[in-house]
Each structure stands twice: as C-alpha cells, then as structure tokens.
Amino acid sequence: MRKYIIMVFGDMEAQYILGLSYYRGEGVEINSEQGVYWFEQAANQGDADAQYYLGVSYANGEGVVKNYKQAVYWYEKAANQGHADAQNNLGVCYEFGKGVVQNYQTAYFWYLLASANGIEKAKDNMDRIAQDLSPSQQIEIQNRATRWFENNNGR
C-alpha cells in the first residue's frame, strides 16, 4: 500500500486515473469530491485530461460548487494543450456566456479547433453560430486557427 501511495502522490497520470475511478465509480464507490481532489493534483502538474474533467466538474457542480469561471479556467488550460473535448466545451461557454462574456467569434474559434481535432458536434456548433458571423470574420478566425495549430504542433 505504501508503494501505491507514493506512486499516486508523485505521478500525474496515476492521479488522473485515480480521480477518474472516483468520478465514475470504477473499482470504488462514486465519490465526486475525491475525484476532484485527484484531478486537481494531476491538473496542477499539467495533465490535460484532468484539467478537462475539472472543467466538467465545475460546470456541472459535481464534487465542487458549480462555478463556470472555474470551468472556463480549466477548459482553457486543457484546450490550449489540444484537448478536443475541452476546446468544444470552451466554445459552448463562449457561445452562451457561461463564465465569460458571450463572444461568438471566440466560440467559433474553439469550435473550429475542436472540429479539426475530430469532435463531430463541434462542427454542428460551429455551423449554428456561423450565421451570426460575416464571411470575413469567419476567414479571419480560420486564419487564426491555422496559426494556432502551427504554434501548437498541430494539436
């Protein structure tokens, strides 16, 4: 047991897996608070999956008090590492003004990245708000996304 505890306290992947186990109730009883605790440990070391799940936890109020500003904070950390689901969820926050000032251009940007990273619903989300953007705005955002991919190793 001591070896296991030492491994978990130092290893962000093990921390993330333990958080996910508590969050989903896999091998242990569901305990959202414990899930959030372990996600925080891994997220603070830079684990994008843990950052994403912290965002989900804050957005849904699971294991923590619902707080969209915190959800956006964690989604943004994960999204900037190329986490496609976080990119889509960040787009949702910007589209509907959850935790941020509503901004269709920023929402479109994050949906575009998520779509390029394989999230099918992001394309639908992007199409939905495209009608509120001019063609020149869409082109500008597409160029920004291209630069983002170039600067982030295609993630």
Tell where the protein language model's regions lie, with residue ranges:
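Alpha-helical solenoid scaffolds that mediate protein-protein interactions
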Residues: 1-4, 42, 78, 114, ...
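Short helix-capping/linker turns of helical repeat alpha-solenoids
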Residues: 8-11, 15, 24-26, 31, ...
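Hydrophobic face of amphipathic alpha-helices that form TPR/SEL1-like repeat modules
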Residues: 15-24, 53-60, 64, 89-96, ...
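Terminal, low-structured helical/coil segments at or just beyond the last alpha-helical repeat
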Residues: 120-155
